Curated annotation (Swiss-Prot):
InterPro entries: aa-tRNA-synt_IIb, aa-tRNA-synth_II, aa-tRNA-synth_II/BPL/LPL, Ser-tRNA-ligase_type_1, Ser-tRNA-synth_1_N, SerRS_1_N_sf, SerRS_core, tRNA-bd_arm. One of its GO terms (cellular component) is cytoplasm. Catalyzes the attachment of serine to tRNA(Ser). Is also able to aminoacylate tRNA(Sec) with serine, to form the misacylated tRNA L-seryl-tRNA(Sec), which will be further converted into selenocysteinyl-tRNA(Sec). PROSITE patterns: AA_TRNA_LIGASE_II (PS50862). It catalyses: tRNA(Ser) + L-serine + ATP = L-seryl-tRNA(Ser) + AMP + diphosphate + H(+); tRNA(Sec) + L-serine + ATP = L-seryl-tRNA(Sec) + AMP + diphosphate + H(+). Its EC number is 6.1.1.11. This is Serine--tRNA ligase. SUPFAM superfamilies: Class II aaRS and biotin synthetases, tRNA-binding arm.
Length: 425
């Protein structure tokens, strides 16, 4: 949620933000028109209340002087003012609701360090780690390698659920589980995160609080009878854990990690990554979420990103980090780093994590604050990132660690979790 006071005071900030995101700026004008009417009504209501208070004093004085007829006239006038105030209050509430609904459609303001660009082609590479492997044989894509090993079954998955679902068997299913446990262990033991287990179904308000609704309703799975939503990411329930709460300053930063399955309709991705496991309706992810103070949030983003990178380094998978441009930036994000792992089947890097500073955007919607040393309450800043997406990491291992004989070598750090060094038929 944007800061209405800031919009009122400095609308140019929001005009510029929407221009950088290549979005229509008309919505700002609509809110400002409604806000002017709202403030005009507020002033009128305050004047009417002041007049009614004066009349009440005059009525009391007249009654004390036994001037009941004059007092009755003023009482009638006061009732008329009361009716007018009631109508104005109703109009004011309608304006507030309309402004709130419009404000929910405005994205976060990009940070000054975010490059201006139209789409993902203008994202800026920040750094690379590792060197893509040069094969002395023709490497296979995971969508061929998995079925040949008898460990991935796209056909039966389609029979069960339709397109963009996967069934895995045996050691590949175990590798998925091993990756989850490995990531949770690293983040809890080395990086100091608190593990949390959360529901996979959340109320509509929770999706609004975290910026997923109303914009992404078409992308979401919804249970119509109960109006509960399957989570698109663990970020949603974790961030909402502290909705309507005032945290203590000494508690910050709060750092949570959670493993969940994630559910996305991918309504806007028709024709993208149609083969294999890159873009699924259901996928596993380990999520990292921070709650911190405003002045610390951008340093926290750097640390959060390094925490996610550490997983790929331990797995010895080559990757790069890119700073997303304004045209590719997420709706709720002020700044995002994508971590992209090298995939031989694409001869390119593919996103395996997005690490974002949401600033106070979600905190304003969910009313998450902390009490500072000044004894005043302030909105927290929230951050989130994948630490990592399990399926895409598994794909990266399959493709980068494959052997000419069709087997897959297990990364050294995962051998204790797997109990074997290779996956074979």
């Amino acid at each position: 949620m944007i800061d209405i006071k800031l919009l009122r005071k400095e609308p140019e900030i929001f005009y510029n933000a929407l221009e950088k995101r290549a979005m229509d700026k008309e919505i700002i004008d609509r809110i400002l028109v409604l806000d002017r009417e709202w403030r005009s009504i507020l002033a009128e209501v305050n004047n009417l209340k002041a007049k009614r208070n004066e009349l009440s004093k005059m009525v009391a004085k007249l009654k004390a002087e036994k001037k009941d007829i004059e007092a009755e006239e003023l009482i009638k006038e006061s009732k008329g003012i009361g009716e007018k105030i009631k109508k104005l209050d109703e109009r004011q509430k309608r304006l507030e609701e309309e402004m709130k609904n419009l404000a929910l459609e405005i994205p976060n303001i990009p940070h000054e360090s975010v490059p201006v660009g139209k789409d993902e082609t203008e994202n800026v590479e920040v750094r690379k780690w590792g060197t893509p492997r040069k094969f002395d044989f023709e490497p296979k894509a995971h969508w061929d390698l998995g079925p040949e090993l008898g460990l991935i079954d796209f056909e039966r998955a389609a029979k069960l659920s339709g397109a963009r679902f996967t069934v895995m068997y045996g050691l590949l299913a175990k590798l998925e589980r091993a990756l989850i446990q490995f990531m949770l262990d690293v983040h809890t033991k080395e990086h100091g995160y608190t593990e949390v287990w959360v529901p996979h179904l959340v109320r509509r308000e929770v999706m609004i609080w975290t910026g997923k609704l109303p914009k992404f309703e078409d992308e979401s799975y919804n249970t119509k009878k109960d109006d509960l939503f399957l989570i698109p990411t663990a970020e949603v329930p974790i961030t909402a854990l502290h909705a309507e709460e005032i945290l203590k300053e000494k508690e910050l930063p709060k750092k949570y990690v959670s493993y969940t399955s994630c559910y996305r309709r991918e309504a806007g991705s028709y024709g993208k990554d149609v083969r294999g496991m890159i873009r699924q309706h259901q996928f596993d992810k380990v999520e990292l979420v921070w709650f911190t103070k405003e002045e610390e949030s951008f340093n926290a983003l750097e640390q959060l990103t390094r925490d996610a990178e550490r997983i790929l380094q331990l797995l010895e998978l080559p990757y790069r980090v890119v700073n997303l441009c304004t045209g590719d930036l997420g709706f709720a994000s002020a700044k995002t780093y994508d971590i992209e792992v090298w995939l031989p089947s694409y001869n390119d890097y593919k996103e395996v994590s997005s690490c974002s500073n949401i600033t106070d955007f979600q905190a304003r919607r969910a009313n998450i604050k902390y009490r500072g040393s000044d004894n005043k309450t302030h909105f927290v800043h929230t951050l989130n990132g994948s630490g990592l997406a399990i399926g895409r990491t598994l794909v990266a291992i399959m493709e980068n660690y494959q052997n000419e004989d069709g087997t897959i070598t297990i990364p050294k750090v995962l051998v204790p979790y797997m109990g074997v060094e290779k996956i074979s038929i």
